[in-house]
A protein has these predicted regions:
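Helix-to-loop junction immediately C-terminal to a conserved catalytic motif
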Residues: 67
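Conserved ABC transporter NBD signature motif
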Residues: 75-89
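Conserved ABC ATPase "signature" region
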Residues: 128-149
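Conserved ABC ATPase signature
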Residues: 153-157, 161
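Catalytic Walker B motif of ABC-type/P-loop ATPase nucleotide-binding domains
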Residues: 178-182
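ABC ATPase nucleotide-binding domains
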Residues: 246, 252-316
Length: 316
């Protein structure tokens, strides 16, 4: 199973002109609480990057900062060469969770149309504007392999279908980068695979840069060009084999970590001796500390482990 970037998507460190994202000494906060500090990132255009870490480690915070929705507390964050807020129109952002309330009662085509930027400029009020909006919605749904869902109500769609429509909404305006917050959450293995195949197609056919956060690293191993792992207010970017290894993870978490490999899957857990000395994972404290277990437990945290029902290890 490939874990390193292929040559066509390899990171080019010799120049920053090809960087979709560049961060130097980046500090992000939620109110008075520092979330991420001193983060260094360089993501080339056209790459797929996985974002992982414990609950509260800052994954959503980082995605929102990249989307221009959250200010930088300290350091530098550049998106396509400028400030993230200036690049907002070039970014499609899909937040975690599913549409609820009034949004859930819309048809899929109307849900996608609600994000068309022409509405902001008054274009949607004219017959020509309505035609352009309809064309943009149709193209976005087709790009997300969701054209057949256009007339369906959002509340009638499966989890995988809803995720495709949400991605279509992010594509209804011309974008160069997609930010997906937990797009695989609560999806069965077949639906997960469908979303990841869509991400691959958007990268390969449209050259989009894609950052997506996930609880489980394993479904993404054949797709990612690099990984960003956040823990303990710090972060590290690199190839999977550079970041998902005991030395790096121990430094991030501030406690001894191990990485086990079995049948092509990765399991991350505190070192066995540490658990015995400290009385188990309930005693080594903090929101950033992962518990140690295998697949099949009902839980909602962000470190990497094999899924209870493992999806295909290699995407087509």
């Amino acid at each position: 199973m490939p874990t390193a970037p292929g040559p066509e998507h390899a990171t080019d460190s010799t120049t920053d002109t090809a960087a979709a994202v560049l961060a130097r000494g980046l500090h992000l906060a939620r109110g008075a609480r520092d979330v991420v500090g001193g983060l260094e990132l360089r993501i080339a255009q056209g790459q797929v990057v996985g974002l992982f870490g414990s609950n509260g480690a800052g994954k959503t915070t980082l995605l929102q900062a990249l989307a221009g929705l959250l200010p930088v507390r300290q350091g530098e964050l550049r998106v396509f060469g400028g400030a993230a807020a200036q690049a907002r129109r070039a970014i499609g952002y899909v937040a975690q969770g599913v549409p609820d309330g009034a949004w859930s009662r819309l048809r899929a085509c109307d849900f996608v149309a609600s994000a068309w930027q022409g509405e902001r400029w008054g274009i949607g009020l004219s017959p020509g504007g309505r035609a352009r909006r309809a064309a943009a919605v149709r193209e976005a749904l087709q790009a997300a392999a969701a054209g057949h869902l256009a007339q369906r109500g959002m509340d009638t769609l499966s989890g995988g279908e809803r995720q495709r429509v949400c991605i279509a909404q992010a594509l209804v305006n011309p974008v160069r980068m997609l930010l997906l917050d937990e797009p695989l959450a609560n999806l069965d293995p077949r639906a997960q695979l469908g979303v990841l195949e869509l991400v691959r197609a958007l990268r390969d056919r449209q050259g989009l840069t894609v950052l997506l956060s996930a609880h489980d690293i394993n479904p993404l191993l054949g797709l990612m060009d690099s990984v960003v792992y956040l823990a303990g207010g710090r972060g590290r970017q690199g190839r999977v084999d550079e970041v998902i290894e005991p030395g790096v993870l121990s430094a991030l978490y501030g406690l001894p970590m191990q990485v086990a490999r079995h049948d092509g899957y990765l399991f991350i857990h505190p070192a066995r001796g540490f658990m015995a000395e400290e009385g188990g994972p309930c005693h080594h404290g903090g929101a950033d500390a992962p518990d140690a277990h295998g697949p099949g437990n009902g839980h909602g945290h962000d470190h990497a482990h094999a899924p209870a029902h493992a999806p295909s290890k290699d995407l087509p």
